[in-house]
Amino acid sequence: MTWKIVTDSGCDLRSLTRQSKELRFERVPLTLQIGTEIFRDDDGLDIDNMMTTMYQSSKATTSSCPSPEAFLQAYRGADNVIVMTITGTLSGSHNSARLAKNELLEENPNVNIHLIDSLSAGGEMDLLVLELERLIKLGLSFEEVVKQITAYQQKTRLIFVLAKVDNLVKNGRLSKLVGKVIGLLNIRMVGKASNKGTLELLQKARGQKKAVSALIEEIQKEGYVGGKVYIAHAQNPKICEQISEKIKSLYPDAVIQTGRTSGLCSFYAEDGGLLMGYEI
């Protein structure tokens, strides 16, 4: 039996730990628009160039979800397909993936396909994909993989830190005055994905050190006691080191992985930001 794990670019991972003929990974890109320029969030995207373009532009920025056809093409070619999308509260990606699932089953009623709304993005999606890979490599049945990943999702969370809010200001979600104050006072916004998939602000911290302390405080409130962590950062390896050191000082056996944010997550987290997934 052959498997595919399919995500959109709300996931930061570009590949699995080890792909094989039996298990492949497909990432369906969203597109990002800055003024009249369009960037496709695939492996060829120069994220640094995209971010420079964004900061140099005064125009509003937008993202567009993949088409059902793009998902359908990614689904084909495997007996078992597990699909995961960025939270449906922020994007139409989940709906496109659902329409493509229906089309695939019309083409091939014998294929097994399961669709997951991550209710999240970034680091939490990354953790879920890595767990899917682990479960599949155990040789479990399709039904058992679905059962176990569903249970696992109840034990994962997302916390984020924003160092810049240019995009929020440009798109009218924050006033220019608030944006300027945040920049001048070096304020970091600390928030989370709710269990409904919406993003919520938890704390405002002045400076990176206080933001790290706030992050640790919030994950402990959620029930973190040393589980796996995946930190996806936007040009900020320093904060990854600070968070990792603090977690390790409290929970020496914690397994922590880090990586760069995808184009989409960089687009919204902005330079210096992060999206961290963790187990409770």
Curated annotation (Swiss-Prot):
User: Which species does this protein come from?
Assistant: Streptococcus pyogenes serotype M1
Q: Which residues form the DegV domain?
A: 3-280
InterPro entries reported for this sequence: DegV (IPR003797), DegV_C (IPR043168), DegV_domain_contain (IPR050270)
**What's the protein here called?**
DegV domain-containing protein SPy_1698/M5005_Spy1391
Q: Which UniProt keywords apply?
A: Lipid-binding
Q: Disulfide bonds, which pairs?
A: none
User: Pfam families given for it?
Assistant: DegV
Q: What PANTHER family does the database record attribute to this sequence?
A: DEGV DOMAIN-CONTAINING PROTEIN DR_1986-RELATED, FATTY ACID-BINDING PROTEIN TM_1468
